[in-house]
């Protein structure tokens, strides 16, 4: 996590363990086990984002090893654009409002940044009070009903959604997907939303700026700036060619995260590693 850099040297006192761990906790034991396993071996580590790859390079476990990044794939034949009005009818959403979507498995997790979304919506209405009756937020995930009273806009709380077909409808029904996460790697939700042609607003953190091309298919807000996040929401809703951004979002996913693209990158990586092994074998004295 961003608050912990013990992995730069050796893991211990892990903040994810009960009580914050200890100097000789499970994280340290696993670290030492990996250290022994990796010693003397030439390993290529693959992260799913460049950000995570950079973090991995800072780990004592990866010293002298090769780290590269290849993203996770998404089924672009399943997550795809559809008719917005039909999707809204199936979801029970209004046809006469702009809709934002915020979703997380556990919305109350402070790392998901719900407080920043609340503040961004407040700033938005303070600056543009006339949009209050024309804008609503779809909130998806556990604890969504508990948090809906905090938003200053109309809220459609839909709880945790397991049905992927319904998920596609939800992404197609909304105008903008908002992800105010303070820590994230390569969020599947951004990938899914963009695959459905829904532009996204997110903070400049983790792998998010790798996914969203600022002012091309979405908006990357300054980290922890609710004001810039609010500006991003308004920009995508009212100031840009939504159809063009939607098209670019879909194209980004097709070019970067489609299964054949990701598979091709893994094939190229394996071929490169095999060639290196062959070169090493030939260079050994007989």
List the predicted regions and their residue ranges:
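Conserved donor-binding/catalytic core segment of Leloir-type glycosyltransferases
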Residues: 93-112, 118-122
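Nucleotide-activated donor-binding/catalytic signature segment of Leloir-type glycosyltransferases, i.e.
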Residues: 128-134, 141-165
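Short alpha-helical donor nucleotide-sugar binding micro-motif in glycosyltransferases
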Residues: 169-174
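Aromatic "clamp/platform" in nucleotide-sugar-dependent glycosyltransferases that forms part
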Residues: 182
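Conserved acidic donor-binding segment of nucleotide-sugar-dependent glycosyltransferases
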Residues: 214-215, 219-226, 235-240
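Short hydrophobic beta-strand element within catalytic cores of glycosyltransferases
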Residues: 199-202
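Carbohydrate-associated surface elements
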Residues: 51, 73
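A short, well-ordered alpha-helix in the C-terminal region of glycosyltransferases
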Residues: 228, 241-256, 265-268
């Amino acid at each position: 996590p961003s608050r912990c850099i013990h992995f730069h040297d050796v893991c211990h006192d892990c903040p994810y363990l009960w009580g914050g761990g200890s100097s000789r906790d499970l994280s340290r034991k696993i670290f030492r086990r990996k250290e022994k396993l990796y010693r003397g071996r030439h390993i290529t580590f693959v992260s799913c984002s460049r950000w995570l790859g950079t973090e991995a390079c800072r780990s004592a476990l990866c010293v002298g090893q090769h780290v590269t990044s290849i993203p996770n794939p998404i089924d672009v034949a399943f997550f795809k654009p559809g008719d917005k009005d039909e999707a809204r009818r199936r979801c029970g959403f209004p046809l006469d409002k702009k809709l934002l979507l915020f979703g997380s498995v556990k919305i109350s997790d402070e790392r998901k940044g719900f407080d920043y979304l609340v503040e961004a919506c407040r700033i938005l209405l303070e600056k543009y009070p006339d949009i209050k009756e024309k804008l609503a937020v779809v909130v998806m995930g556990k604890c969504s009903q508990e948090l809906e009273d905090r938003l200053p806009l109309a809220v459609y709380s839909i709880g945790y959604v397991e049905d992927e077909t319904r998920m596609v409808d939800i992404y197609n029904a909304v105008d903008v997907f908002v992800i105010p996460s303070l820590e994230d790697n390569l969020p599947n939700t951004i990938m899914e939303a963009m695959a459905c042609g829904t532009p996204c607003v997110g903070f400049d953190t983790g792998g998010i700026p790798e996914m969203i091309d600022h002012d091309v298919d979405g908006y990357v807000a300054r980290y922890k700036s609710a004001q810039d996040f609010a500006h991003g929401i308004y920009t995508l809703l009212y100031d840009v060619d939504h159809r063009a951004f939607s098209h670019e979002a879909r194209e980004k996913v097709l070019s970067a995260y489609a299964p054949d693209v990701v598979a091709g990158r893994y094939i190229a990586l394996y071929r490169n590693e095999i060639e290196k092994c062959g070169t090493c074998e030939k260079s050994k004295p007989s």
